[in-house]
Amino acid sequence: MLIYGSEASLSFLAESNDWFMDGTFSVAPPQFSQLYTVHGLRNGHHVIGCYGLLANKQGDTYIEFLQQVRQLTNDAQPTSIMVDFERACINAITVVFPQANVIGCLFHLCKSIYRHVQSTGLQEQYLVDEVFRTNIRMIAALAFVPLGDIITAFEELSQHCEGNEDHILDYFEVNYIGELRRGRRRNPLFAHTL
């Protein structure tokens, strides 16, 4: 693991209450799995605080990375951290920064839904069928529904959809709503609070 950032960027990150983190794989050198960035937001300015070259996407790796970032930022205590929906990273954040409010990134949520559209062979329908496309977009719009109304809104949307949306709704239900079994909802993979 390699972590790098300037004194100024790490200082900026240390003084930022809101952090944003993401990894990318295409630009990582061959001996690493991903390039991970941690950004800070302060006074309307968004700056990359540090970069990390990580060997894999395992929880222990994320924990070690975040502990090092915390040390490099003089034990910074961000109040919120926005991330993609990577379970291992979310778990690591709750270990290293338990006080931080973890927020899921809407862009990554939409990207995840669209990847599922593609993997189920529905990309062509998404491109040509405006009603289908709108219904899929309405699934992602559930992110804007008040927490107490998410399940009801999901159920209403499910009743509204009449076609291939079921494949996407099933995926969304298991991961983000909580699958209905024997009259009770299981916990989703990702909490509604994300």
Protein language model annotation of sequence segments:
Residues 21-23, 51, 82-85:
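Short His-Asn-centered micro-motif
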Residues 26-29, 54-57, 82, 160:
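Conserved, non-catalytic sequence blocks in retroelement Pol enzymes and Pol-derived host proteins
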Residues 3, 7, 51-52, 67, ...:
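Short alpha-helical patches at protein termini and domain edges
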Residues 30, 51-75:
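Active-site beta-loop-alpha junctions of metal-dependent nucleic acid enzymes
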Residues 10-11, 27-29, 45-48, 58-61, ...:
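Eukaryotic short linear interaction motifs
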Residues 1-35, 41:
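Structured nucleic-acid-interacting core domains from mobile-element enzymes and related host factors
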Residues 72-194:
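Extended amphipathic alpha-helical interaction segments
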Residues 35-38, 47-56:
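A short, conserved beta-strand element enriched in hydrophobic/aromatic residues
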